[in-house]
């Protein structure tokens, strides 16, 4: 059958499914359907999600849950034990005393599979509960501190080679001068806690502490140093780490500068937003083992533009030095499009995954959710819209100026990403997710070399007047790595007529990008085909003028 006939048949098949393909068949990931973890009429916000360290079928998520009549705040408990096929749980953590719960959960699963949850209370303080039956029942409350504080975040040492294997950590900002980061540890699955200790002694108040495990028992924390007057804009990022289980910390109060977005976002119904840092570390044993990544939301400080952008900084030497900022979102700079609330996760292959709210494909009063994925430590990014419906952010009445939640989250399990976020498409803010299958992770963990042919989806798409097409020629083996082969990249219209040849030359192994300028062509659907001696793939793109 001729190429022309094949393309015509392909066109007839795909035209009715254009929207579905744009949402669900994206490059090297397969995006499923959006669904709620625990459908209810309760407001659900500020979600976290973690995976069991030795049983990837078990995933645990928690969030703020708010009931208004009578007014009650608790922590949702949402669990799957079958890899995400089904979820169970409750909008109320059942650890006594239930009436004294106050939300703001921090969660972890330790080496024994014990769920540990920290929360604030009806009065000042930080409290914890644990579950040894996958969230079905919970312990009575354990008091960690009676201080007034910002929510705690948690991590657990699940690396058997670590001298602190099994220890779990909680970190938070204390709401008293000088507003330092504090922490406590538990060695018995949350049954008892160490006396809280101070990590840093900031000149400018700390905000938004985050914590994660590195290799060899190292623990890393980060926070934002904020300005001294409202709106307390994030001014720089501080980082600290301990190599001895928290006995001592090496502190860098200003690891790198930032310019955050703390305040109200007028374009989104005056919701409250922030630029607080989120940290992740590669512990895969691959080529970027030990790399540390911190993501923030910034504007008016390069590489961020005049609109809020997602910015990544990384350290390849254990936090001793930090890269310049890397702009993650790939939409045009200063285009009046807004990205905010990023969450970061390194999967088992060393892939770097970020989710964030983004309005590039909708109106300025609405938002969708995007995934950005890098398989080379943040040098190059692929982006995918993962929400199948946009929503209009609005504050939740009665919960403080502009409140609709302050963070989202992401984890991975069994070759799938599990992002979680809140949106109000059903009328109430609810926690949503979507399984994202990493269908063909193509970077060799040992060599860091590309091992599969790839033809990426063009970006932007739809486009006007130009778009970029990225493709990959793999390394076959060491003896053939320098060999080249003939590569053609051609564009066809819907009738199968060749429009232009973008490339017709020999290429060696590597990642390439070609720009297609369509200013002389009419609007419509086009197809681009990559052909080599051993690989052929065709994708569609839409020109809208």
What are these model-predicted stretches?
Residues 5, 28, 34, 313, ...:
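Asparagine-centered polar/low-complexity signal
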Residues 437-449:
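Low-complexity, Pro/Thr/Ser/Gly/Ala-rich linker/spacer regions in secreted
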Residues 14-15, 62, 471:
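Alpha-helical transmembrane segments and their juxtamembrane interfaces
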Residues 21-440:
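Extracellular, repeat-based ectodomains that mediate carbohydrate processing or recognition
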Residues 15, 53-56, 460, 478:
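Short, proline-centered helix/strand-breaking motifs
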Residues 5-15:
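Sec-dependent N-terminal signal peptides
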């Amino acid at each position: 059958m001729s190429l022309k006939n094949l393309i015509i048949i392909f066109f007839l098949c795909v035209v009715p499914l254009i929207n579905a393909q744009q949402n669900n068949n994206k490059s090297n990931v397969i995006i499923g359907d959006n669904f709620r973890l625990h459908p209810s009429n309760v407001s659900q916000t500020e979600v976290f999600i973690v995976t069991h360290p030795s049983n990837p079928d078990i995933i645990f998520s928690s969030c703020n849950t708010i009931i208004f009549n009578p007014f009650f705040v608790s922590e949702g408990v949402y669990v799957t034990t079958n890899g995400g096929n089904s979820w169970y749980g409750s909008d109320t953590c059942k650890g006594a005393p239930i009436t004294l719960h106050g939300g703001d959960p921090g969660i972890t699963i330790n080496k024994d599979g014990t769920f540990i949850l920290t929360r604030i209370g009806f009065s000042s303080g930080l409290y914890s509960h644990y579950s040894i039956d996958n969230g079905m029942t919970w312990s009575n409350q354990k008091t960690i501190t009676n201080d007034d504080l910002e929510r705690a975040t948690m991590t657990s040492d699940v690396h058997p080679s670590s001298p602190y294997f099994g220890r779990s950590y909680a970190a938070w900002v204390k709401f008293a001068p000088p507003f330092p980061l504090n922490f406590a540890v538990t060695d018995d699955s949350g049954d008892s806690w160490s006396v809280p200790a101070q990590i840093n002694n900031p000149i400018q108040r700390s905000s938004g502490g985050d914590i994660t495990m590195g290799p060899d028992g190292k623990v890393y924390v980060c926070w934002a140093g904020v300005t001294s007057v409202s709106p307390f804009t994030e001014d720089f990022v501080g980082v600290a780490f301990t190599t001895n289980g928290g006995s001592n910390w090496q502190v860098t109060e200003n690891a790198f500068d930032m310019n955050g977005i703390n305040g109200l976002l007028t374009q989104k119904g005056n919701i409250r937003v922030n630029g607080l840092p989120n940290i992740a570390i590669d512990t895969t044993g691959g080529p970027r083992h030990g790399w540390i990544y911190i993501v923030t939301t910034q504007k008016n400080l390069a590489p961020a533009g005049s609109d809020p952008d997602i910015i990544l900084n990384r350290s390849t030497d254990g936090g001793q030095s930090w890269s310049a900022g890397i702009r993650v979102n790939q939409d045009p700079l200063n285009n009046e499009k807004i990205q905010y609330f990023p969450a970061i996760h390194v999967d088992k292959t060393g892939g770097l995954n970020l989710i964030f709210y983004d309005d590039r494909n909708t109106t300025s009063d609405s938002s969708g959710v995007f995934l950005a994925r890098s398989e080379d430590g943040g040098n190059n990014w692929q982006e995918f819209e993962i929400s199948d419906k946009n929503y209009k952010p609005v504050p939740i009445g009665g919960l403080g100026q502009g409140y609709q939640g302050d963070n989202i989250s992401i984890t991975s399990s069994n070759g799938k990403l599990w992002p979680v976020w809140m949106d109000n498409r059903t009328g109430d803010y609810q926690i949503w997710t979507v399984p994202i299958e990493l269908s063909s992770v193509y970077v060799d963990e040992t060599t860091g070399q590309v091992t599969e042919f790839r033809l990426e989806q063009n970006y932007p798409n739809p486009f006007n007047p130009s778009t970029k097409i990225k493709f990959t020629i793999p390394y076959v083996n060491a003896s053939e790595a320098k060999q080249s082969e003939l590569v053609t990249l051609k564009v066809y219209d819907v009738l199968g007529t060749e429009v232009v040849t973008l490339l017709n030359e020999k290429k060696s192994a590597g990642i390439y990008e070609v720009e297609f300028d369509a200013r002389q062509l009419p609007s419509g659907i086009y197809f681009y085909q990559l052909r080599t001696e051993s690989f052929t793939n065709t994708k569609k793109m839409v020109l809208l003028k």
